[in-house]
UniProtKB/Swiss-Prot annotation:
The keyword Protein biosynthesis applies. One of its GO terms (cellular component) is cytosol. One of its GO terms (biological process) is cytoplasmic translational termination. The keyword Amino-acid biosynthesis does not apply. Responsible for the release of ribosomes from messenger RNA at the termination of protein biosynthesis. May increase the efficiency of translation by recycling ribosomes from one round of translation to another. The gene is frr. This is Ribosome-recycling factor. GO terms for molecular function: ribosomal large subunit binding. Its main location: cytoplasm. PANTHER family: MITOCHONDRIAL RIBOSOME RECYCLING FACTOR PSEUDO 1, RIBOSOME RECYCLING FACTOR. Keywords: Cytoplasm, Protein biosynthesis. It comes from Laribacter hongkongensis (strain HLHK9). InterPro entries: Ribosome_recyc_fac (IPR002661), Ribosome_recyc_fac_dom (IPR023584), RRF_sf (IPR036191). Transmembrane segments: none annotated. It is found in: Cytoplasm.
């Protein structure tokens, strides 16, 4: 029972870290990467479809993304979707290929992005702590039902606290790396 609670807690904490990494990947730095456009959708015959399902997204160079549309009639829609996204990108259409240059980040924009990342990091820390709280509540329930002793509960709580510390430290490390990446010119 205790091991199940620990395994569930660790699994949920790991998923929180993965979600945080995914969120960090969306935050634009000065460099281009193909995953930057993954969350942008385009109207494809009446349904919202991610860009990577209607085109090849590749890197042309460190500061330019190339989008090779599979159907010529989709080029204008894809270009508009990229332009209208919240990323502040200005795509240029060249037939079937759309070039998306990455504008240099201003100091002010870097600070704003750092604040956004800091907020996301705090949300991830809170999520990890909520998993700890839920696991500790499950342990208290087992103790109330006399399924475990107080010593077992205390040991399990200590183990869960160690897991929490480990995953909060991981969030802090990821945040520090992203902050350094954002502030690098």
């Amino acid at each position: 029972m205790i091991n199940d609670i620990k395994k569930t807690a660790e699994s949920k904490m790991q998923k929180t870290i993965e979600a945080f990494k995914h969120t960090l990947a969306k935050v634009r730095t000065g460099r281009a990467h193909a995953g930057l456009l993954d969350h942008i959708t385009v109207d494809y015959y009446g349904s919202d479809t991610p860009i990577n399902q209607v085109a090849n997204v590749t890197l042309i160079d460190a500061r330019t993304i190339g989008v090779q549309v599979w159907e010529k009639n989709m080029a204008a829609k894809v270009e508009k979707a990229i332009r209208d996204s919240d990323l502040g990108l200005n795509p240029m259409s060249m037939g079937e290929v759309i070039r998306v240059p990455m504008p240099a980040l201003t100091e002010e924009r870097r600070r704003d992005l750092t604040k956004v990342v800091k907020g996301e990091a705090e949300d991830a820390r809170v999520a990890v702590r909520n998993v700890r709280r839920d696991a500790n509540n499950d342990l208290k329930t087992l103790l109330k039902d006399k399924d475990i002793t107080e010593d077992e509960e205390r040991r399990a709580q200590d183990d869960i606290q160690k897991l929490t510390d480990k995953y909060v430290a991981e969030v802090d490390k990821l945040f520090a790396e992203k902050e350094k990446e954002l502030m690098a010119i």
